[in-house]
Amino acid sequence: MFNRKGCSVKFKLIFPTLLLFHTVGFNMPNGANEIESKIDRLLNKMSLQDKIGQMCQRSGADWNYDGVKAGKIGSILNAVDPEKIKKLQKLAVEESPHGIPLLIARDVIHGFRTIFPIPLGLAATWNTELIEQGAHVAASEAASVGINWTFGPMMDISRDPRWGRIAESFGEDHYLTSQMAVAMIKGLQSDDLTKPDAIAACAKHFVGYGAGEGGRDYNTAYIPEQLLREVYLKPFHASAEAGVGTLMAGFHGVNGIPSSANSFLLRNILRQEWDWNGVVVSDWASIHELIEHGYCADGKDAAQKALIAGIDMEMTSTDYEEYLQELVNSGEVDIKLVDGAVRNILRLKFNLGLFENPIVNADQFPKMVNEDYLKMAKKTAIQSVVMLKNGKNSLPLSKNIKNIAVIGPLSDDPFEQLGTWTFDQNIEDSQTP
């Protein structure tokens, strides 16, 4: 019988191996101890309000310049205008209380301007080298406008065809998903996060999001612990070992506990068993949605439970901003939890080299959607094609055929050729059949 006690013994035995890998992981920066010392000095200077500000992510649609200037925002989501990003970073480093740069985040799922096949198509190539190269293209293009963090790859295992986000996944197999996820992480983060064309990756959605009951998005998932460890956690563990910079908790609940308040997943497994020290971010307003789950009474309760469980940064909702100071002052939340979360966030910013180079020089990057990038995208698309059945030997087509009719309402729609989850492409760059 599989039980937590047995697992605890197992992980204690292999813990030195995991710790060694963490120490020599491919993106572990030189001078890690020096970075920790810098974080110590910075934390000692910061007020509680300053620290809470680092834990808050706001939407770029709000363009909250005053909040950035006041040090009340640690990250901006969905900002893509390079001039506005530059203005935000200048405010953060030149006018905020401690000059801490911003994490600029964007969903760069299968390309930024140059669009590659959807993740399910990427998995169908079985070509990790090509996937890594494509992810590097996406990172370079995104970094050229000032983005330094993306919410991908998604590594949710789904075996229910009714689930609506399968296109964003690498499919139903945990081994293939692990291989593809690691390839994308290496492409996005390069071998050194301080490189100008590297951005932080994000392993999402932790964990079991694709196993929702009835294939319904956001639905709760019931997963026996053995299945959780042998299937659903595998890609995340591989990503942690590969040095992924961040991880996103899911909207859903696992075995009755929402992911954004699940200390067994976020503290026991992620932090203690795996010894991972990256940033854990909530999904969009998922901390406040703990109320909708029926798990929390109000925003104050949600902020308390989320931080205790291990959420470092709150995406878009404002429960941390509104209630954490009160919770710490009343003794309901230990200040050490706040310091730990902020340490993780500051470490990522140091690892990205943002304190040294917060403002991007677009001239150092290749042209977006250049010929080489397009050739790579086309090569990936060709390799992603899967033939399930060749009825009556229809393929290969005769060389004597001169014209082929492509029929359907979307056959000549340039946007629909791009697949789901694309935001920043130029439609004129899209080529229909």
Which functions belong to the PLM regions below?
Residues 26-433:
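Glycoside hydrolase catalytic-domain context in secreted enzymes
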Residues 1-32:
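Bacterial Sec-dependent N-terminal signal peptides
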